């Protein structure tokens, strides 16, 4: 009986400590989630001009992309391909920047696009200096860059074209399905192993073949 009050007190202290710890952990997780959401939004905001420049370039210079990938054994990251599957299903009025912030594979795309020798040229056309990743904004290392006037001007210019670009990004690529010369060139340039992988890729993408950006489909045929 002498130790009963002490044991009860210790139990209560431990219970209170557990509740405090649990509450703190929940707040930490919520804070971390909010930080990640804000960081992804900031990265999408900063990279939007480059994304638009890339989509336009990829549409018009498709043969150059596929040729370079074949010669250098580059592959299209699956998360990037998955995002384009998703993108072409977006409504023409969709907010592409918001969608990119939610689900775009920033890191995988950076790895892919920086492998091309004309990456710097695309940056210059977009008036950008690099591709920003969400983690850059979590660390705060880009804060000074994001406040300059050239960035603000770039942001306003891009935001006005986003809804239009959302629809055109997919539709312009789909129109490439009619370019038989490009398809023939890709098939003839592939070896027997590539041809086998092409067949597998076509079967896997059959359900969405009418909607998948044909430029990216061509890259799958060559690279996977």
From Swiss-Prot:
Cite a single GO BP annotation. response to pheromone triggering conjugation with cellular fusion
Coiled-coil region list: none
Question: Would the keyword rRNA-binding turn up in this protein's UniProt record?
Answer: no
Kindly give the Pfam families that the UniProt entry links to this protein.
Answer: SRP1_TIP1
Coarse class of the primary localization is secreted
Q: Where is the lipid attached (GPI-anchor amidated asparagine)?
A: 203
- Please give the GO cellular component terms listed in this UniProt entry: cell periphery; extracellular region; fungal-type cell wall; side of membrane
Instruction: State the membrane topology.
Output: Lipid-anchor; GPI-anchor
Q: Which residues are glycosylated?
A: 148, 181, 191
Q: Identify the stretch annotated as signal peptide in this record.
A: 1-25
What post-translational events are described?
A: The GPI-anchor is attached to the protein in the endoplasmic reticulum and serves to target the protein to the cell surface. There, the glucosamine-inositol phospholipid moiety is cleaved off and the GPI-modified mannoprotein is covalently attached via its lipidless GPI glycan remnant to the 1,6-beta-glucan of the outer cell wall layer.
Write out the entry's keywords from A to Z: Cell wall, Glycoprotein, GPI-anchor, Lipoprotein, Membrane, Secreted, Signal
Residue ranges annotated as propeptide in the record: 204-224
Task: Supply the InterPro entries for this chain.
Answer: SRP1_TIP1 (IPR000992)
Question: Is Transferase among this UniProt entry's keywords?
Answer: no
Subcellular compartments: Secreted, Cell wall; Membrane
Instruction: Explain the induction of this protein.
Output: Expression is up-regulated by the MCM1 alpha cell-type-specific transcription factor.
What protein family does this chain belong to?
A: Belongs to the SRP1/TIP1 family.
Summary of the function given for this chain in its UniProt record: MATalpha-specific protein that interferes with a-factor, the pheromone secreted by MATa cells. Contributes to mating efficiency. Acts to bind and sequester a-factor rather than to degrade it, and promotes the efficient mating of MATalpha cells by keeping the a-factor concentration at the plasma membrane within the narrow range needed for accurate pheromone gradient detection.
Full protein name? A-factor barrier protein 1
What organism does this protein naturally occur in? Saccharomyces cerevisiae (strain ATCC 204508 / S288c) (Baker's yeast)
Q: Which gene encodes it?
A: AFB1
């Amino acid at each position: 009986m002498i130790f009963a009050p002490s044991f009860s007190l210790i139990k209560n202290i431990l219970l209170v400590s557990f509740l405090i710890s649990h509450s703190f952990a929940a707040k930490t997780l919520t804070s971390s989630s909010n930080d990640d959401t804000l960081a992804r939004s900031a990265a999408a905001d900063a990279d939007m001009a480059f994304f638009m420049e890339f989509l336009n370039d990829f549409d018009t210079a498709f043969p150059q992309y596929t040729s370079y990938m074949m010669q250098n054994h580059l592959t299209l990251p699956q998360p990037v391909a998955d995002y384009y599957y998703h993108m072409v299903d977006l409504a023409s009025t969709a907010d592409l920047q918001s969608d990119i912030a939610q689900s775009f594979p920033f890191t995988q795309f950076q790895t892919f696009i920086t492998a091309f020798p004309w990456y710097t040229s695309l940056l210059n056309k977009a008036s950008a200096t690099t591709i920003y990743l969400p983690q850059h904004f979590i660390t705060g290392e880009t804060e000074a860059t994001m406040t300059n006037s050239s960035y603000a001007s770039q942001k306003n210019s891009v935001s006005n074209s986003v809804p239009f670009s959302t629809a055109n990004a997919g539709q312009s690529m789909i129109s490439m399905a009619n370019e038989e010369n490009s398809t023939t060139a890709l098939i003839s340039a592939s070896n027997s192993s590539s041809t086998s992988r092409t067949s597998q890729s076509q079967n896997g993408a059959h359900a969405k073949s009418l909607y998948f950006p044909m430029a990216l489909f061509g890259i799958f045929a060559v690279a996977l």
